[in-house]
Amino acid sequence: MMPLKKRQRQTLVCSNCKRRKSRCDRGKPACGNCIRLGNRETCHYFISPSEKGGDGGDSPGESAGSNGALERWQFVRAHSCGRVDLTAGRTVVFGKRSAVYVAGVLSTDAVRYRDLYLELLSVFSHAAIKKTVSQLHAQAQVGAQEASLPNSVKRVIRMEDEGMLQESSPYILAKHKKVHQSLVDGFAQSRYEGRQQFADVEEAAKQHLVERYIFLQKVLPAFKKHVLPLIPIYDERMLCVTVEQLYDDYQKRGKFSAKNGDLITVATILLITRLVYLAIRFDKCSVVNVKYNRILELDTEPYAALAYELLPRDKLLRKVTLPQLQCLILLRFHNWCSPMDGDGESLQYSNVLMGTIYACCKEIGASWLSFKEPDKYDFAKARGSNSRFTMAFAEMEPGEVDSANESVVKLYQQIWAVVLHWDRNVSMLTGLEPIIGTSMKPAAMSSYNNWYADMISLDYLKWQLLTRINEDPSEVNLEEVKPIISEIRQRLGQFTSESELAFEQELILQLVELSILHAAFIGPTSNVSAAEHRKNYQELLERIIHLSGIFITYFHDPPTTNHQYGRFYTNKIVEVAMYRVYQILTGLILRISSACQDQSLKPTLMKFYKNLCSLYFNELGYDYYQVFKRLFEAKVKYKILEQTANPVFIMLRYLFAEIQSGNMESMKSQELIGLIYGEYKKMGGELNLDMMDLWNHIVPTQCDHNIGLNSLFTTEIFPTDQYSDYNLFVSFYDYASNKLTEDTNQAAEKSIAHNPSTSIHDLCKGGASPHFDLLEGILDPLDFMTYLDSIPGET
């Protein structure tokens, strides 16, 4: 009898629990036992000693691991087909002087740290900043007008002012100086008023309280018509009664009553007025609506800062009332719409306020319970002891109390629907776990006739999507995620609303898909076929083009004869989307510039990149502070990508020169630097070593798919000569960015053109150019502010 033939398949053994697993399951980073015991990070598989030998050939997994990356980096990132790692093997925590926050796996920050090309750019920025503080400090003197701006902006302003004196064209000089000074003055004033402290809060409330006639006859009707549909958290009658009661009491007494909740009502009036002001200001209709001129004459800049001061004075962190909760939600809404940095550069502040709002909802009973058992709510004891509830029932007969109960329950349901929707949206934008940890599938609520009530029926799908992502973000199953997104989009199509909220929801879904696709594209290629990798690459470019078309339509094709008072709201999601596309496109151009022999696609992408930046900064840079802060960063990046044949070579040249000179010892603790330096030592240290060979050894990159992709860009989607009169992106900081890059570009061209294989040792012996240290010093605004704001004597 012939012996049974054994299967010739190597057994993989866990390094922790010594359990075996079949090689077909190797794509999973860790065994189930180690995951259960919390030993995921130390779980690795090795070939069982009894099965080593044979012909001595490496398995595909072994050959992939010997490609230069450290075992942890290579192994954690290895996944089976259909799965993607959104974490890049780590949970990144960012910090600056005023905040510490974790980077969500779907956020724009995640795009930067997931792509090692962009991370190298970030590390390079850190190193350049530290070396340039003293040089920038000498140029930091600015006038008192810009005193409230960050030091990072002050120094660039000073450098730019030097360049104005050298302009040749009088017209361009006058135009540039006017725009430059207008932007600086405007943002400086807004930052000052938005961050000011009030010595006497009640006196400030009296000073800024909107006149009764203007608020009741101008502001409140506009709020009900244009803003309240976007955030339906008020009963219109209750709101009117409360506001009129405040004005009556203030007229009689001449002061506010804390016991009656007057300060919360004042904060509500201020925030409502500010939101209406923003709605009118960002309307792009060419026909001026003169009935709102009185509102535009108000100085609403300090209103949000004053509301922040008024809210805690009613013991908000200890207890809460319904008007306080509504005011908090209104403040959250304002922070999202604010042209200043209300939610933070990475939306990190939104979760803090959302957590407070969620706790307040639970405290007053606005939760899923209001949908499950609405008939069981009894507000009798609240009516008897709380004047805010009494106002809702004041004009009702005893027999109408039941209908009043129903109106309050309905208000609770609307508040919960709004809070739930905001929580899910922020989670889908950032990838962070949602604050509200439960969901349900309620019946349709046709009686509400608003967007948030419709979205309640979709919440269980959003919850499933976020659960799939957050259960194990290092191994997201695309076969589970994609159908959920498709079903959400299909269900959204059933609601025929063309409101700003529908536009925002669709754009958020597209950003989720874009982030997941980006993670799949830059992930390890050892377990992905060349055809699949090219497919991801092409789809990524197609999505970038598609989203850019949405941006162009949004800015250039709005109806100019109809008022669009909702643009103050949708501008924010468009800004978030454009910035994410901008970051991804930067990484793609970096890869093409440094890893592809076929450079035919780079000029096309650079033209597209310039047009996208021009659209972003010309449409949003005049009004939005976060966009303004990124202007110089984007200008320097563009010049590096455009004028340098191999940007990665430039960055590696700088970093290794610093290592050799002993200036970067502390930075070796950073994982990427430690990885690069470790591989550098393994490959011969100071011997003649091609830096690009070193980089490609660490980050193997498939970049042979450019042929034929130029056809994607044959149709010109950007309007020609749209900003021919004055292009903010092209003109602004032109002198300063040239000053930072001029010497380095010359050095790079000489090094790469004449000796592409220049060794690290030879480069380190060369003298540093005077402006090379400034090249990327302001690439990351947060880092730049962190270092420069700590200089003694600076404000």
Curated annotation (Swiss-Prot):
Function: Transcriptional inhibitor with a significantly increased number of target genes in response to oleate.
Primary location: cytoplasm
Keyword Transcription in annotation: yes
One of the Pfam families matching this protein, by short name: Zn_clus
Keyword list, A-Z: Cytoplasm, DNA-binding, Metal-binding, Mitochondrion, Nucleus, Repressor, Transcription, Transcription regulation, Zinc
Gene: OAF3
Family: Belongs to the OAF3 family.
Entry's Gene Ontology molecular function annotations: DNA binding; DNA-binding transcription factor activity, RNA polymerase II-specific; zinc ion binding
PROSITE patterns: ZN2_CY6_FUNGAL_1 (PS00463), ZN2_CY6_FUNGAL_2 (PS50048)
Protein name per UniProt: Oleate activated transcription factor 3
